Structures are given as structure tokens and as C-alpha cells.
Design a protein with these regions (language model features):
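Cytoplasmic helix-loop-helix junction between adjacent transmembrane helices
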Residues: 99-138, 323-324
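C-terminal membrane-cytosol helix-exit motif in multi-pass small-molecule transporters
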Residues: 167-189
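Paired small-residue
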Residues: 83, 94-102, 290, 301-309
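Juxtamembrane intracellular "pre-TM" segments in multi-pass secondary transporters
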Residues: 1-3, 181-215
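Helix-breaking motifs and short loop linkers at transmembrane-helix boundaries and internal kinks
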Residues: 36, 68, 89-94, 243, ...
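Helix-to-loop junctions at the C-terminal end of transmembrane segments
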Residues: 56-68, 263-275
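Short amphipathic helix-loop junctions that connect adjacent transmembrane helices
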Residues: 27-39, 232-247
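Structural signature of the two symmetry-related core transmembrane helices
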Residues: 71-85, 278-293
């Protein structure tokens, strides 16, 4: 299987996985709120998902090094499907939180495996573009998913999108089984299997790198905006303060996602051409300004303007931090490095 065929295959798989997350994103806060709980518990539905990823990313990276990438790319969607199906069946907030944790675990398995898979098939000069392509697939799924989720919830009920996502997870696992060959080399497997206990610290040497820790801080900020603000607080604010309905929320989130779809490939090209740091600094600033506007906005147009600015910044930043981490890591650190990188994003 040629490199670009592998890239296309992993991108299709990512679209399917992330469409599921996009489908539930606009309705999750409303679904949790329907249990009559506090705003803190509504936010906990996102926290539970993120906590599972936080705890799973590094073990997933190590598992990818030891047992191969395919197990994560197939098993992750199946675990997510189970979590989503259970979320739809939940009759208390605590059951919902438990199944959200399971769904997050599956998400971590897949996304960590997919990132390592990309680094296996990309040269150093291609990393920005390959990561951008996969993030573009992610944005397609997350971007178009909300409109579908809003329409499904409006047509049926708030639990139906979870069942749709569960079916999609099973289909993704089947697709990955037939279309994604193993990319871990025999030499990588031998190193991971035979490494002596005394050599283990070398895998974590990146934690002593100032550059790695700084890009980790940037990653924390970018992912916090996406999950903590855009997926939790923004839907509630738009619904409660500006009166948007669930289908309107879905369309707005889709529009924001389209910004990323348009910008992510040029961002990957720029990352490879001009360097990672040149992209990271100005776009991180743009994200901060956009969220500041959202925080003080008292009109819908101003609120949407702030959201748009943060979406533009997030889209252009996209591939740069991951490519930067890949540049810092040696081949035997790859699984641990990507696990740590994704852990920063889930803090």
C-alpha cells in the first residue's frame, strides 16, 4: 500500500470517528441538563471524556509501540461505540458520566494510534502536511457532525444521536480492519519488547526539554478552548442568553468547523515551509484575543465574531505543535512522545 493511499485511508477513518464526536457536541450539554443537574455536572460530561483520554494517552502510545498501531485503530472505535450506546441509554447523570468516560477511553486509543501511524508513514519534510490532512479529516467530522446531530435530536430526541454514533463506531472499526495495514516495523517491535528496565527513562527524556514543555503549554491552551469553552460553555450561553435552538446550534458549529476545513491544509504547508514556531506564536495570540471577546460579548454578532477569531487561530495552529513534538522525538520515543503530547491536550 503506497504512502498516500495509507494517508487517505487513515483520514477516512478519522472522519468517521470524529463525526461521532461532532454529532453529540451541540446536544451533549442540553442532554445532560435534561437530568435537572447543576452547570458543574453538565460540564463534567465533557470532563469525564477528557479525563479518560488524559489517563489513556500515554499507555496507548506504549501499547502502540509494543503491540502495533492496528489494535488501537480497530479497538478504539469499538470502545467508543460501547460508550456512546451506553450514554444514550443513561437514565441518571452518573450513568451518563460513566459511559462518557468509556467513550473517552476509546477516543484516546484511536487518536493516539492514528497520530503515531501518520508519523510512521511521513518523512520529516511531510509531517506538517500529513498531520494537517488528518486534522482536516478531524475537522470535517467535527464540523459537519453538529448539523447532523442537531437535526437528529430535533427530529427524534436528545438520546438518538448517541445511538447513531455507536453504529458509526462499529463501521469505523470494520473499515480500519480492512483498510489500515500495520506500520510498526519489526525493528520497532523488537526495541519496544526488549528494552531493559534501566533504559526506560530515555523514553521520558522529553519531559526535561524546555521546548517540549512549552509546546505542551500551547497545546493545553488550544485544546482547552475547543473542549472547555466551545463544547461546553458556548452552547449553553448561546441557548440561554441568545435563544438559539438545537438545530441552529448545530448549523453554527458546522460553520465554525468549515473554517478549519478551509485553512488546515494551507496551515500544514506553512508549517513545513516556514517552521513550527513561526506558526505557533501568532496563532496562539489570535486564539486568546478571540476568547477574550467571547467572554465580554453582550450581543450575538460580537459573540460569533470572537468564536470565529478563535476558530481561525485554532485551525492555523493545528498541525504545528504535533509536528514540532515529532521533530523533537527519536524513533524509539515516538509512542511515548505522542501519548504525552495528547495528554497535554486533555489536561
Amino acid at each position: 500500500m503506497k504512502t498516500y493511499e495509507q494517508l487517505i485511508a487513515i483520514c477516512i477513518s478519522t472522519v468517521l470517528v470524529m463525526a461521532g464526536q461532532g454529532i453529540v457536541s451541540p446536544i451533549l450539554p442540553l442532554y445532560a441538563d435534561s437530568f435537572g443537574v447543576s452547570t458543574a455536572l453538565v460540564g463534567a460530561t465533557v470532563t469525564a471524556f477528557g479525563l479518560a483520554r488524559l489517563l489513556t494517552n500515554v499507555p496507548a502510545g506504549m501499547l502502540a509501540d509494543r503491540s502495533g498501531r492496528r489494535k488501537l485503530l480497530i479497538g478504539g472505535p469499538l470502545v467508543t461505540a460501547f460508550g456512546m450506546f451506553g450514554s444514550g441509554l443513561a437514565n441518571t447523570i452518573w450513568i451518563l458520566l460513566g459511559f462518557r468516560f468509556v467513550a473517552g477511553l476509546g477516543s484516546a486509543l484511536y487518536m493516539t494510534g492514528a497520530t503515531i501511524y501518520l508519523l510512521d508513514i511521513a518523512s520529516a519534510e511531510q509531517r506538517g502536511r500529513f498531520i494537517a490532512a488528518n486534522q482536516g479529516a478531524l475537522l470535517v467530522g467535527v464540523g459537519f457532525g453538529p448539523a447532523l446531530g442537531g437535526l437528529i435530536a430535533d427530529r427524534y430526541d436528545l438520546s438518538m444521536p448517541f445511538y447513531v454514533v455507536a453504529v458509526g463506531g462499529v463501521l469505523t472499526a470494520v473499515y480500519s480492519f480492512f483498510r489500515l495495514p500495520e506500520t510498526r516495523s519489526a525493528e520497532q517491535a523488537r526495541i519496544a519488547r526488549d528494552v531493559a528496565p534501566g533504559d526506560q527513562p530515555s523514553r521520558w527524556a522529553l519531559l526535561r526539554s524546555t521546548d517540549f514543555l512549552l509546546v505542551g503549554v500551547v497545546t493545553i491552551g488550544v485544546f482547552s478552548v475547543r473542549a472547555g469553552v466551545r463544547q461546553t460553555l458556548v452552547p449553553l450561553q448561546l441557548s440561554d442568553s441568545f435563544g438559539l435552538k438545537v438545530d441552529e446550534l448545530g448549523l453554527l458549529f458546522t460553520a465554525l468547523g468549515l473554517i478549519g476545513v478551509v485553512l488546515i491544509w494551507p496551515a500544514g504547508l506553512a508549517t513545513d515551509r516556514f517552521g513550527r514556531k513561526t506558526i505557533i506564536v501568532p496563532t496562539a495570540t489570535l486564539i486568546a484575543v478571540g476568547i477574550g471577546i467571547v467572554a465580554v460579548a453582550d450581543t450575538l454578532p460580537l459573540f460569533i465574531a470572537g468564536l470565529t477569531m478563535s476558530a481561525v487561530g485554532s485551525s492555523i495552529t493545528g498541525p504545528a505543535p504535533a509536528a514540532y513534538v515529532a521533530d523533537l522525538a527519536t524513533e524509539d520515543q515516538r509512542g511515548a512522545a505522542m501519548g504525552l503530547y495528547r495528554t497535554f491536550g486533555d489536561i
